[in-house]
A protein has these predicted regions:
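Low-complexity, intrinsically disordered segments with a bias for serine/threonine
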Residues: 12, 33-37
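Bacterial signal peptide processing site
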Residues: 23-25
Length: 250
């Protein structure tokens, strides 16, 4: 049975990378002194709490170092979940910045189409945008809902009954959630959780989350609290999907 690993990275002035494995925590203390990566120590810290890695080396090489500090080896088909950005001026992670990491893990860049119009609303338009931004020069790019979507179970939600994700998600054994931090007019902040929920959702799934479970066919955004709760539930659903498949999440 395949294992699926998700690693979440966050970029904001420093790079932060969290993992929940005690084994990884031990590895972090062994590697931080040689890589320049700082792992803050907290008195009486819960041994099961995530470890957060920080580095001031905001470069392609620094991104690889903070990934390697985990001591986790990729396997099988590796998906690197990014945001391709709505325009050249948006704050998405640039291809040159992520290239070394993607090549290190032999990854496929993955995304899903948007649900609000714009230049990523269809697979054809999205492919054009991906080419214009230069992502295809880094690696193969898979639009995961280009051939439809699938439902995965949701547990802790009073709004959505399931999460609708790109069908190609099931094709990967190992996923890196590579997110950038930003202010977001609806979500408050965009980052790892948004990239794992809205980002992995298909176009229909995005409408379902934004409408707090009311529709998959039109844009509704009048229930802000319901949307935020649905987004959190969708992120949890992706996590639980991997766990229930008998795989793994790191």
């Amino acid at each position: 049975m395949k294992r699926i690993t998700i690693i979440s990275l966050l970029t904001i002035a420093v790079m932060a990378l969290s993992a929940t494995s005690c084994k990884v925590q031990k590895k972090a203390s062994e590697t931080s002194s040689t890589t320049g990566i700082v792992v803050p120590s907290t008195p009486n810290q819960d041994p099961t709490a995530p470890v957060v890695y920080f580095t001031s080396d905001i470069s392609p090489e620094g991104l690889v170092k903070i990934y390697e500090a985990l001591g986790v080896k990729p396997f099988g088909r590796v998906a690197v979940k990014i945001s391709t950005g709505e325009s050249e001026e948006s704050n998405h992670l640039r291809p040159d910045f992520i290239k070394n990491l993607v090549n290190t893990v032999n990854g496929t860049l993955v995304e899903c189409n948007t649900a609000y119009g714009g230049n990523r609303a269809t697979t054809e338009l999205h492919r054009k945008a991906i080419a214009e931004r230069g992502f295809e020069k880094v690696a193969t790019v898979d639009i995961m809902d280009s051939e439809g979507d699938m439902q995965i179970p949701v547990v802790d939600s009073k709004h959505i009954k399931y999460d609708i994700v790109g069908a190609h998600l099931q094709n990967y054994d190992f996923m890196i959630n590579l997110a950038h931090f930003k202010g977001h007019t609806m979500g408050g902040f965009g980052g790892v959780l948004k990239n794992q929920s809205i980002g992995v959702a298909s176009s229909r799934g995005k409408l379902y989350i934004h409408s707090a479970g009311r529709t998959t066919s039109r844009w509704l955004d009048d229930d802000q609290d319901g949307f935020l709760e649905s987004m959190a539930a969708a992120a949890q659903a992706v996590h639980n999907y991997f766990k229930q498949e008998g795989k793994d999440i790191i």
